[in-house]
Amino acid sequence: MFYFDKKDDRVLFCDNRQLKTILCDGRDYEINPDVLADFTALPFEDDTFSLVVFDPPHLLHNTESEITGWQQIKYGALTGDWKSELRKGFAECFRVLKPDGVLIFKWNETNIKVSEILKLTPVKPLVGHKSGKRSNTHWICFIKN
């Protein structure tokens, strides 16, 4: 995941799944969050965190209840109404952020342009950066007012 030291108690990793598998290239892959939680209903009080990193799934291809394919296993997949799902995710991130807290949002434009995603949050982004081989991964920073 994003943090450098998985034992650093300043970091809390949430995911809605816990799994241990072998990827198609033979590598072991494990998702072992500190807290099992859905990003649309975070189990934290309002104004809890100074910094939140929001890296939701960006793939739309999964129509089954079980995730298949190495990308979907590794990154997850949006199901159902992705606009509603991401809108709720942004709302939850801002709810758990303290006033003047920072939200770092990561998005890959594999299926959906970042311009469509930014329509789903009421807070305007402050700064952003494109990265990746094709510059289709976006890192965007917001500040809660």
What function would you assign to each model-found segment?
Residues 1-145:
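Class I S-adenosyl-L-methionine-dependent methyltransferase catalytic core
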